[in-house]
Amino acid sequence: MAKFKFKKGDTVEIIAGDDRGTKATVLAVLPKKNKVIVEGCKIVKKAIKPTEENTKGGHLNKEMPIDVSNVRKVEA
C-alpha cells in the first residue's frame, strides 16, 4: 500500500470539482478507498426516517469523501 500524505487535521485546498479553491480541514482519511473527507466540502442532503429518538425525521447535511487527486496539502 502506498504512503498516504494526508492526516486528520491537515489543512488542504480543493483543486477540482464544485468546491474548487476552498481551504478546509481533513476530518477523516480513507486509505483503502484513496479518499479523504474534508470539512464543509462536497455536502449532500441525506433523508432521515422518523425513529423513536428522532420522531420528525428530516434531512441531514453530510460531507462525502473526495478523491485525494482532487486535494492539495496547504502548508499552514
Swiss-Prot record:
Its biological purpose: One of two assembly initiator proteins, it binds directly to the 5'-end of the 23S rRNA, where it nucleates assembly of the 50S subunit.
SUBUNIT field: Part of the 50S ribosomal subunit.
Gene Ontology cellular component annotations, sorted alphabetically: ribonucleoprotein complex; ribosome
SUPFAM superfamilies attached to this UniProt entry: Translation proteins SH3-like domain
Name of protein: Large ribosomal subunit protein uL24
Protein family: Belongs to the universal ribosomal protein uL24 family.
Pfam families documented for this protein: KOW, ribosomal_L24
Keywords assigned by UniProt, alphabetized: Ribonucleoprotein, Ribosomal protein, RNA-binding, rRNA-binding
Gene3D superfamilies the UniProt entry points to: 2.30.30.30
Organism: Sulfurimonas denitrificans (strain ATCC 33889 / DSM 1251) (Thiomicrospira denitrificans (strain ATCC 33889 / DSM 1251))
Segments traversing the membrane: none
Key word rRNA-binding present: yes
GO MF annotations, alphabetized: rRNA binding; structural constituent of ribosome
GO biological process: translation
